């Protein structure tokens, strides 16, 4: 009855007390943090795109000191006409002959290059099924000079004139620069061992035979090699559109090494810092820049023109300036 009821509040039976709630301690929330954006499909191991990427054959990276194989009738014929050194000419049996193929075989025979006939399937395997048109030319690795030997040979014919390439990537530019070095009395070319165009069949063809006369050396560290050359009395001049010295003001009568930067980025920071001066080519306002090989040719031509003039004694030059 109301007022005298002895009923107590609800009592939980013993052994059934819920107790204090226990959470995850934030583990679930923290587990979702810091994962960043979802990676691309080809980087997720179990995604079909990743499986397809793993199934694709990977082409090995070609090293600069490996044998090169030139494929196709026109490229092979150009190499043979340019006198590119080769060890073997491969011709697939049953290949339809034309004037190019006939000339390739004749030039290879005249040059003492081995002519090897093989099944087309074997040539397919040898060239990884590239479009070889039934013919391939094997070119051995280029025999690079040592930087010290290159400098010593140049100093024996003073004043030395060398060209260093700072991560130039196009072998056609390398070949064109070799051609300019030969045309304007230079003694050789220096390239980095890594991240640089090497003397391939493409460079050899572009050089128009200059590769047979102009030595090319490879430096493990281009900056350190240039420092060593500077210590031996060679002046290092960099070539850059933003250079502080105009080409007209450069004294080209001393022993020089002209450093040409890469096609896109120009001179690297360390190489630029170690140049005695950075030279620019005066151009018309409408022209923004020159191709690397063209710029190198312009500078080499200017230096050669200075060296053809009789050198005045320093005293006469100073008296005229006074």
Swiss-Prot record:
GO terms for cellular component: cytosol. Belongs to the class IV-like SAM-binding methyltransferase superfamily. RNA methyltransferase TrmH family. Gene3D superfamilies: 3.30.1330.30, 3.40.1280.10. One of its GO terms (biological process) is RNA processing. InterPro entries: Alpha/beta_knot_MTases, Ribosomal_eL30-like_sf, rRNA_MeTrfase_TrmH, SpoU_MeTrfase, SpoU_subst-bd, tRNA_m1G_MTases_N. It comes from Mycobacterium bovis (strain ATCC BAA-935 / AF2122/97). GO terms for molecular function: RNA binding; RNA methyltransferase activity. CDD domains: SpoU-like_RlmB. This is Uncharacterized tRNA/rRNA methyltransferase Mb3610c. Disulfide bonds: none annotated. Residues 1-69 are annotated as: Disordered. It comes from the Bacteria.
């Amino acid at each position: 009855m109301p007022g005298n009821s002895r009923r107590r509040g609800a009592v939980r039976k013993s052994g059934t007390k819920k107790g204090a709630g226990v959470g995850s301690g934030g583990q679930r929330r923290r587990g979702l943090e810091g994962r960043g954006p979802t990676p691309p499909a080809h980087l997720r191991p179990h995604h079909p795109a990743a499986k397809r990427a793993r199934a694709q054959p990977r082409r090995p990276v070609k090293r600069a000191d490996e044998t090169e194989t030139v494929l196709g009738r026109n490229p092979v014929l150009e190499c043979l006409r340019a006198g590119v050194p080769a060890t073997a000419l491969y011709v697939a049996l049953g290949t339809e002959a034309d004037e190019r193929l006939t000339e390739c075989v004749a030039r290879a025979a005249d040059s003492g290059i081995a002519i090897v006939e093989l099944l087309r399937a074997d040539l397919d395997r040898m060239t990884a099924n590239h479009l070889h048109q039934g013919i391939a030319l094997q070119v051995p690795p280029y025999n690079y000079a040592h930087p010290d030997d290159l400098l010593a040979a140049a100093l024996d014919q003073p004043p030395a004139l060398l060209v260093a390439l700072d991560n130039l990537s196009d072998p056609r530019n390398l070949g064109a620069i070799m051609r300019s070095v030969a045309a304007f009395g230079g003694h050789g070319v220096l390239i980095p061992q890594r991240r640089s165009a090497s003397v391939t069949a493409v460079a050899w063809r572009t050089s128009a035979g200059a590769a047979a006369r102009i030595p090319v050396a490879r430096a493990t560290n281009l900056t350190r090699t240039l420092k060593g050359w500077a210590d031996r009395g060679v002046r290092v001049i960099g070539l850059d559109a933003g250079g502080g010295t105009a080409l007209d003001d450069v004294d080209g009568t001393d022993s020089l090494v002209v450093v040409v930067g890469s096609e896109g980025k120009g001179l690297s920071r360390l190489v630029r810092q170690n140049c005695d001066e950075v030279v620019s080519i005066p151009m018309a306002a409408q022209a923004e820049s020159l191709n690397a090989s063209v710029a190198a040719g312009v500078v080499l031509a200017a230096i050669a023109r200075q060296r053809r003039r009789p050198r005045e004694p320093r005293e006469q030059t100073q008296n005229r300036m006074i």
